[in-house]
Each structure stands twice: as C-alpha cells, then as structure tokens.
C-alpha cells in the first residue's frame, strides 16, 4: 500500500464527515434568499483548500456568487493541473418528494442522500482530499490549481469575465473535471465528451387578462392549448425534431464509433425498471445510449399557466409559459440553435396569440481526443484502481464552461467523474455512494502521477 493510500485509510471517516458538513450548506445559486449561504459555502471551500495544503486560497467576488481560487506550486518545472468544480447546487424542489432533508445529509445503505452529494460537492471535494493526501505524504508531482465556482447551475454567467481577466493566474497544462458519471463501478468509464446546451423560455399571450372560462371559453384561444400544440409540433412521428435547420451542422457518427458504443454494458430492462417506465422513447434509428450521448435533443423542462393552486378555479388564462432545453452535439452552435428555436415558435404561432421568447443560457459541446496523453493518464489511473480499462463514452449532460476554457486557456479537458446515472442529479433524493467518493480520492493522485510521467 502506498503512502497516500495509507493516509486515506487512516482519515477516511474524517473525509466523509467534512463532506457532510459541506452538504449542510444550502448553496442554491438560483434563489436570492440563499445569497448568504453562497458566501458561507465559498468560505468553507476556501478553508478546506487551505487545510488540505494549498498555499493560496482566495475568494473572488463577482457580480453574482463568488469564485474560489486555490493553488499549490511545488516546483515551476512540474506540469500544472487546473481542477474545476462548482459548489452551487440545484434547487431542492419539490421538497415533499425527498425521503430526508435535502440539506440534512443522510447515509442509507452506504449512500449519501443530499442535494449536491454528487453534483458537484461530493465530486470536487474528492480533489481537495486527494490534495491533502499528497501534501501530507510528500507525494506531490504536479502543481495544482483550483477554480471552484458558485454559478454553474445557472449557466456560469460571470466565469468568462474571471477567466479572461486572469489568464496568467490560470496557466496550466490540463484541466481536470469531476462532474460526470461512470457506467457502473463494475464497468468504469470516462466521458470523452459532453453535449452543448441551449436553454430557452417561451411565453404565449392570449387575452389581456385571465377570463371566466364559462363566459369566454370556446370563443377565445386558450394560451395553454396553443402552447401545448406548438410544443407537440416540435417532434414528428419518428420523434425527429422538426425545427428547420436543427440538424444542419450535425456530423453523423461513423459506423465504427456506433459499434464501439454498442459494446458498452447496457441493460434495457434494468433501465426501464429503474425509471418506472413501461417502454422507452426517442429518435427512430438510434439506440438509447446513442440518443443520450451522440444525438441532439429538445426537451420541455417546465410548462405552466392559469390556475395551479389548491382546489378549482375556472379561468381561461391570459398567458402560458414553457422552458425548453436543447442538448447539442459537436459542430452544433448554441447560438445558432437558440435562434432557430426562437424563430420556429414565433413562425408557427396562430394570429390569436402573441409569442415572445428569450434565451436563458447556453454552452458548446466538447470532445476529448482519446489518443491524447491527457486522456491516457486518466485511463491509466482508473485502470490502476479499478483493475480494468475504462470504457470511453459520450456524456449526455452539458458543462458549458468547457469551450470557454479551451478557447481562452488553450487547454484540453479530462473528465474523471465517479457518479452514476442513477444518482438522481437535479431530482429529489440526490445521492452519492460512499464507495465512489473514496474510490475517486484514491484514483486522483494516480492521474497526477501518470500525467507528470508523460509530460
């Protein structure tokens, strides 16, 4: 057993308790009532970096929530690894569906249940504890920098300003991110890419006020009905997206790439059982793994209007709203897709309503070459601790800052995520397996070792 593994074994209970303390802070970036919690969480992250051995741990204020920067420069001749993560979390709603308090971390059957357990507190904190292991055992072989932001869940609106203003500070040789998932602990994998994102809100307005549905119903267009029809028109009978030009820039995956994806373990019955669905859905001609990894999508994230309170209220609403996200694949542009979606909804609106639409945020897709020494270092690290080679896969989610880092810092990005698709990210009862948390802490130092050797 090497020195850092011995240190982990001796301190793993403390590592876990420190993570639970961090999870108790309700750092919800989307809600202004949590602004004080965001500040408290940033301070906690900075302190954890200092305690782990960082020479610098600074909180940078932004127009929104703070960014925490940390670094340890061991030797200027060593390669430098920039670790990115985020301490903000999604809103916990609906609270009534949680089995325990979202900010009262609870351990059940070896799993941590709490908002942010996997996304991303549990995952970025692995790097903090790996840093502590390496500093305390004199095992540092790279310089390490940290950028832990507080606005990832709302589109990172202030990160670009920070990155562009601090290019010298952020100079590195690679960016390492743990904010993705594996197939399973028995079948380790590495995300070699993430999809881009276009997030849009649609507002449909009919009459100038809510109306009595008995007096006006049948004579005035109902915005909810109109919006529902417009949304339904976005897919055809093959579940193909109908928006003109949506697929124009999509580069079809090669037969060999699709064959490689088909080798990844996937149990369709288990997939359906886990989700409680009778059957799957999706674009005709593609497998479930392809639909969630290499194909673009359009999903309705929310739709509302009229009266949704307790009891009954017979109104014909003035307005209806929907929030829509599109996941994008390499060569698609979030700006282009956003414009196409906005124009489409306006073009198909009947003349008895008006439609307004606007963009919330977006990001570009990203791919890591599997023949790069950055990827190979991660693959070797995972093979060392898991005892088998990881499978390269495409992630279905989005990390909008990837293209920013690549463009501004000129660095390749490696995704080393230890979550699982079943971890209920963005949903009630988010979880993170303790064994995954520990395995990540064990694996990360090997990445630094192998990356330094390759450099």
Name the predicted role of every residue range:
Residues 1-95, 319, 336:
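N-terminal helical capping/dimerization or prosegment-like subdomains
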Residues 87-89, 147-155, 178-182, 206-208, ...:
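Acidic, glycine-rich active-site loops and adjacent beta-strand->loop/helix elements
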Residues 120-193, 455:
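Acidic/histidine-rich catalytic neighborhood of metal-dependent amide-processing enzymes
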Residues 189-205, 414:
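Flexible glycine/proline-rich, aromatic-decorated loop/lid segments
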Residues 217-239:
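A short core secondary-structure module
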């Amino acid at each position: 057993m090497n020195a850092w593994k011995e240190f982990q074994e001796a301190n793993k209970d403390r590592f876990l308790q420190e993570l639970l303390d961090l999870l108790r802070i309700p750092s919800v970036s989307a809600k202004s009532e949590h602004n004080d919690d965001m500040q408290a969480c940033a301070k906690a992250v900075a302190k954890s970096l200092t305690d782990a051995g960082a020479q610098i741990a600074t909180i940078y204020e932004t127009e929104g929530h703070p960014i925490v920067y940390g670094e340890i420069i061991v030797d200027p001749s060593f390669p430098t690894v920039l670790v990115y993560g985020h301490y903000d979390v999604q809103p916990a709603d609906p609270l009534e569906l949680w089995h325990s308090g979202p900010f009262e971390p609870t351990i059940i059957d070896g799993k941590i249940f709490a908002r942010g357990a996997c996304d991303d507190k549990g995952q970025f904190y692995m790097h903090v504890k790996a840093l502590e292991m390496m500093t305390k055992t004199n095992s540092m072989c790279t310089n390490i920098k940290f950028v832990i932001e507080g606005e990832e869940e709302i589109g990172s609106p202030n990160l670009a300003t920070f990155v562009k203003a601090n290019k010298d500070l952020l100079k590195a040789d690679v960016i390492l991110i743990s904010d993705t998932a594996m197939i399973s602990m028995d079948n380790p994998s590495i995300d070699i890419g993430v999809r881009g994102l276009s997030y849009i809100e649609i507002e449909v307005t009919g009459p100038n006020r809510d109306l009595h549905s008995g007096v006006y119903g049948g004579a005035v267009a109902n915005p909810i009905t109109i919006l529902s029809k417009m949304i339904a028109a976005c897919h055809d009978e093959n579940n193909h997206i109908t928006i003109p030009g949506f697929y124009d820039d999509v580069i079809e995956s090669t037969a060999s790439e699709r064959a490689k994806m088909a080798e990844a373990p996937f149990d369709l019955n288990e997939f359906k059982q886990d989700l409680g669905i009778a059957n799957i859905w999706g674009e005709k001609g593609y497998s479930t793994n392809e639909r969630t990894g290499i194909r673009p999508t359009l999903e309705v994230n929310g739709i509302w209007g009229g009266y949704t309170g307790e009891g009954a209220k017979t109104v014909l609403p003035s307005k209806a709203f929907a929030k829509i996200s599109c996941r994008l694949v390499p060569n698609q542009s979030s700006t282009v897709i956003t414009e196409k979606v906005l124009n489409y909804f306006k073009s198909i609106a009947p003349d008895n309503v008006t439609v307004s639409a606007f963009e919330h945020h977006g990001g570009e897709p990203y791919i890591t070459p599997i023949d790069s020494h950055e990827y190979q270092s991660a693959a070797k690290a995972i093979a060392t601790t898991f005892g088998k080679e990881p499978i390269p896969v495409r992630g279905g989610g989005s990390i909008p800052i990837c293209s920013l880092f690549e463009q501004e810092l000129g660095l390749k990005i490696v995704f080393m995520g230890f979550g699982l698709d079943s971890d209920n990210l963005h949903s009630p009862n988010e979880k993170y397996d303790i064994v995954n948390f520990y395995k990540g802490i064990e694996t990360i130092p090997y990445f630094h070792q192998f990356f330094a050797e390759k450099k």
